[in-house]
Amino acid sequence: MTAPLTLLIVEDETPLAEMHAEYIRHIPGFSQILLAGNLAQARMMIERFKPGLILLDNYLPDGRGINLLHELVQAHYPGDVVFTTAASDMETVSEAVRCGVFDYLIKPIAYERLGQTLTRFRQRKHMLESIDSASQKQIDEMFNAYARGEPKDELPTGIDPLTLNAVRKLFKEPGVQHTAETVAQALTISRTTARRYLEYCASRHLIIAEIVHGKVGRPQRIYHSG
């Protein structure tokens, strides 16, 4: 069995980093979740805790995450990096890919998509640690993890077609906006269930997810029709 991992979130917006951490805590396989708000803190935590996976934002108060990524590559750091950034320009994407990032997620991140990334990461790590020599099929599975998707006619575990259809109907009209709480109230389901369906819809580009910062309190995740 693969040993639990330490995961480091490098994100300067503390409430957003805490939202990511809260989601990841419900995913098995990560024993410790650390938060760093800038590159200096990230370097210190990497040196001290040796996280197996780093969720790295690109634009930080004291520099760019891509520069830290280059440092890790030059140091032959054994952990993996997932870029979590609003930078969708192809130059940054290409640079990150050349550095060997495990995945590249554009903000606002759909948590269903983040969950898929973390699941693939754990599966690949388990395969690398559990076998001494690999067959071509196993190598193909490792390298084709990004290309494989769920069959179009199949839904992932925990997504019921009737409930999914009910959620999608709430967004029929242009400009409709909901939160997990309003969907939960409308369909008489729990907020956790509502959030799961909303994140699934966002990951399939059926709706759009955004983070809205209020004057006080934590940022709120809003979902709306395109």
UniProtKB/Swiss-Prot annotation:
Q: Biological process GO terms, please?
A: phosphorelay signal transduction system
Residue spans binding DNA:
180-199
**What does the UniProt PTM comment say about this protein?**
Phosphorylated and activated by DpiB.
Location in the cell reads: Cytoplasm
Q: According to the UniProt record, list the residues that bear 4-aspartylphosphate.
A: D57
Pfam families, A to Z: HTH_64 (PF20714), Response_reg (PF00072)
Name which cysteines form disulfide bonds. Answer: none
Q: Which domain of life is it from?
A: Bacteria
Q: Which GO terms describe its molecular function?
A: DNA binding; DNA-binding transcription factor activity; phosphorelay response regulator activity
Which keywords does this chain's UniProt record carry? Activator, Cytoplasm, DNA-binding, Phosphoprotein, Transcription, Transcription regulation, Two-component regulatory system
Q: Where is the Response regulatory domain?
A: 6-122
> Where is this protein chiefly located?
cytoplasm
Among InterPro entries, the record links this protein to: 2C-system_Tx_regulators (IPR051271), CheY-like_superfamily (IPR011006), DpiA-like_HTH (IPR048714), Sig_transdc_resp-reg_cit/mal (IPR024187), Sig_transdc_resp-reg_receiver (IPR001789)
GO cellular-component term (any):
cytoplasm
State the function annotated in the UniProt record: Member of the two-component regulatory system DpiA/DpiB, which is essential for expression of citrate-specific fermentation genes and genes involved in plasmid inheritance. Could be involved in response to both the presence of citrate and external redox conditions. Regulates the transcription of citCDEFXGT, dpiAB, mdh and exuT. Binds specifically to the dpiB-citC intergenic region.
NCBIfam families in alphabetical order: PRK10046.1 (NF007467)
Q: What is this protein called?
A: Transcriptional regulatory protein DpiA
Species assigned in the record: Escherichia coli (strain K12)
Name the lineage.
Bacteria, Pseudomonadati, Pseudomonadota, Gammaproteobacteria, Enterobacterales
GN (gene name): dpiA
